[in-house]
UniProtKB/Swiss-Prot annotation:
Pfam families: DnaJ (PF00226), DnaJ_C (PF01556), DnaJ_CXXCXGXG (PF00684). SMART domains: DnaJ. CXXCXGXG motif repeats lie at residues 147-154, 164-171, 186-193, 200-207. It is found in: Cytoplasm. Binds 2 Zn(2+) ions per monomer. This is Chaperone protein DnaJ. Zn(2+) 1 binds at residues 147, 150, 200, 203. The keyword Ribonucleoprotein does not apply.
């Protein structure tokens, strides 16, 4: 049985991602062929990269823990990658050939060593103005890229890749045990179905290597919080010429100091003086695209009233229609008054009381409370 990935990295099965990365970097530095003359350095370095490639991916790691080293390694060598995040093994796929043989199925066709690369996820935070206008962002991340020395074949230039003579290119051998036929990964080609006699020195026969990447991604106008944008073929490069995975950019929009977002509508709190509330008028309010517009305040506006500015909200993806901006009125009462202001308010107070006494509405309301 092969040494499992946790043993290769020297960590426990409960190790955190931080512990895994720390162990990987330490071992990769120790066994990198360019920094040591040890005979088994290249083999060890390849094992370390393979182990970390699986355990750093939560979905691959879960599948590895569930199915075990040998089954996982065999399934992955057959290209058992999923569409979202890499390896999503299906128990029916893994043991499908076993039950096919039990029911009288024939021998499988030769497998391909060109496993699809894993999908990648990148979290990108933008502000509300960027979400409104749309923006092009440069992002940086590390991933497996196609080897530019062997062009993804995994073999030195000019060297041919041959079909494994032990399994006939199937990637598996079969053992008859009584009534049952058990299939296991080929010991000679490790389930690849092919033999690389002279592996590429740069990628160690994998057809890909780890590299820091820079990529420009376009964020469309009107993007909403938690939107996922797919970039086909920008994920990890496949093994030995396999198709690349996809890159998924998950958008998070920062909270804004003024606006709250509700779909395509924007909400904001608008403070006005009690004089403007009583008499009405116009007031300038800021808008998301920049600048200000005039908002009409009707006479008699009350605290908590809501006034709407049509088509002054967020833009919508793939649409010319915009949401609205809804202003929530907050009437401010002055804390400090001049002598003249106080006199005017006292006069206003007297007139207000007289009006209520004359129309009887105030006394009728008070009377109803005690009846």
């Amino acid at each position: 049985m092969s040494q499992d990935y946790y043993q290769i990295l020297g960590v426990s099965k409960t190790a955190s991602q931080a512990d895994l990365k720390k162990a990987y970097l330490k071992l990769a530095k120790q066994y990198h062929p360019d920094t040591t003359d040890a005979k088994d350095a290249e083999k060890k370095f390849k094992e370390i990269n393979s182990a970390y490639d699986v355990l750093k991916d939560e979905q691959k790691r879960a599948a590895y823990d569930r199915f075990g080293h040998d089954t996982f390694q065999y399934q992955q060598s057959r290209g058992g990658g999923g569409n979202h995040g890499g390896f999503h093994p299906d128990i029916n796929d893994i043991f499908g050939d076993f039950f096919s043989d039990f029911m009288g199925g024939g021998r499988r066709k030769p497998t391909s060593s060109k496993a699809r690369g894993s999908d990648l996820k990148y979290d990108l935070t933008i502000n509300l103005e960027e979400a409104f206008h749309g923006i092009e962002k440069n992002i940086s991340f590390s991933s497996e890229v196609k080897c530019d020395t062997c062009h993804g074949t995994g073999s030195e230039k000019g060297e041919t890749v041959t079909t494994c003579d032990a399994c006939g290119g199937v990637g598996a051998t079969r053992i008859q045990q009584g009534f049952f036929t058990i299939e296991q990964a080929c010991h000679k080609c490790q389930g690849n179905g092919q033999i690389i006699k002279n592996p590429c020195k740069k990628c160690h026969g994998m057809g890909r290597y780890h590299k820091q990447r820079n990529l420009s991604v376009n964020i469309p106008a009107g993007v909403e919080n938690a939107t996922r944008i797919r970039h086909p073929g920008e994920g990890e490069a496949g093994i030995r010429g396999g198709n690349s995975g996809d890159l998924y950019v998950d958008i998070a929009i920062k909270p804004h100091d003024i606006y709250k977002v509700d779909g395509a509508n924007l909400h904001c709190k608008l403070p006005i003086s009690f004089v403007n509330a009583a008499l009405g008028g116009e007031i300038e309010v800021p808008i998301i695209e920049g600048g200000k517009v005039n908002l009409t305040i009707p006479a008699g506006t009350q605290n908590g009233d809501q006034l709407r500015l049509r088509s002054k909200g967020m833009s919508k993806m793939r649409s010319t229609i915009r949401g609205d901006m809804l202003t929530h009125i907050h009437v401010e009462v002055p804390k400090n008054l001049s002598k003249r202001q106080r006199e005017l308010l006292e006069e206003f107070k007297k007139e207000s009381i007289n009006e209520k006494e004359n129309d009887g509405s105030f006394f009728n309301k008070m009377k109803s409370l005690w009846s």
